[in-house]
Amino acid sequence: MSRIGNKVIVLPAGVELANNDNVVTVKGPKGELTREFSKDIEIRVEGTEVTLHRPNDSKEMKTIHGTTRALLNNMVVGVSEGFKKELEMRGVGYRAQLQGSKLVLAVGKSHPDEVEAPEGITFELPNPTTIVVSGISKEVVGQTAAYVRSLRSPEPYKGKGIRYIGEFVRRKEGKTGK
């Protein structure tokens, strides 16, 4: 039994949910998100509560049920509160700059890396070594942050690179000399 799928989604004040043949549009103070869901799952909107129902208890239906509920809840949270991921840069001379909506990273290469912000994503730099990726879509925020991190992943010997704030990087011992 999918416990996540059975939870009720409560719509906060200022958030509207429209279901048109399982193409769900969620509007809120931060923006609007639209996504198409499986036609097997029935989405019911009753006032400020949204419930999801599946036709049977097969394994496939249980997985789709829980996933649909989680994606729908992420849409509601995104348009009401938004999502953000914070990254930090460690290394001598590693720094970031903003040029319009473009993020320019100096991460020890012969050239600076430039990252164009996808639609709906904003970059913020509280200081030159901290990057905040924010937006209303949890999926796009996570993908963008993962791409920025992949430009210089933390290496295990000195720990240099771009990492999520709070991420543990396993360190290795170097070679021992004679």
From Swiss-Prot:
One of its GO terms (molecular function) is structural constituent of ribosome. It holds the Pfam family Ribosomal_L6. One of its GO terms (cellular component) is cytosolic large ribosomal subunit. SUPFAM superfamilies: Ribosomal protein L6. This protein binds to the 23S rRNA, and is important in its secondary structure. It is located near the subunit interface in the base of the L7/L12 stalk, and near the tRNA binding site of the peptidyltransferase center. Belongs to the universal ribosomal protein uL6 family. PANTHER family: 60S/50S RIBOSOMAL PROTEIN L6/L9 (PTHR11655), LARGE RIBOSOMAL SUBUNIT PROTEIN UL6M (PTHR11655:SF14). NCBIfam families: L6_bact. This is Large ribosomal subunit protein uL6.
